[in-house]
């Protein structure tokens, strides 16, 4: 996997992965929270 041993520990893939995870996770948590709130408001 790591052929070059002089490769730095901090590589751009980590930042792209962090961005993708937060772009998907934050609206999902907000959406689930909104649905849960709707269940309590309706009743």
UniProtKB/Swiss-Prot annotation:
With its partner (PsbE) binds heme. PSII binds additional chlorophylls, carotenoids and specific lipids. It is found in: Cellular thylakoid membrane. GO terms for biological process: photosynthetic electron transport chain. It comes from the Bacteria. Pfam families: Cytochrom_B559. Its main location: membrane. Keywords: Electron transport, Heme, Iron, Membrane, Metal-binding, Photosynthesis, Photosystem II, Thylakoid, Transmembrane, Transmembrane helix, Transport. It is a single-pass membrane protein. Its cofactor is heme b. The chain crosses the membrane at residues 18-34. Heme binds at residue 22. GO terms for molecular function: electron transfer activity; heme binding; iron ion binding. GO terms for cellular component: photosystem II reaction center; plasma membrane-derived thylakoid membrane. InterPro entries: PSII_cyt_b559_bsu, PSII_cyt_b559_CS, PSII_cyt_b559_N. The keyword Metal-binding applies. Heterodimer of an alpha subunit and a beta subunit. PSII is composed of 1 copy each of membrane proteins PsbA, PsbB, PsbC, PsbD, PsbE, PsbF, PsbH, PsbI, PsbJ, PsbK, PsbL, PsbM, PsbT, PsbX, PsbY, PsbZ, Psb30/Ycf12, peripheral proteins PsbO, CyanoQ (PsbQ), PsbU, PsbV and a large number of cofactors. It forms dimeric complexes. Belongs to the PsbE/PsbF family. This b-type cytochrome is tightly associated with the reaction center of photosystem II (PSII). PSII is a light-driven water:plastoquinone oxidoreductase that uses light energy to abstract electrons from H(2)O, generating O(2) and a proton gradient subsequently used for ATP formation. It consists of a core antenna complex that captures photons, and an electron transfer chain that converts photonic excitation into a charge separation. This is Cytochrome b559 subunit beta. It comes from Synechococcus sp. (strain JA-2-3B'a(2-13)).
């Amino acid at each position: 996997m790591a052929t070059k041993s002089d490769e730095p520990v901090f590589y751009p893939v980590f930042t792209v992965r962090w961005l993708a995870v937060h772009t998907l996770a934050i609206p999902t948590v907000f959406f689930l929270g909104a649905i849960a709130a709707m269940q309590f408001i309706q009743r």
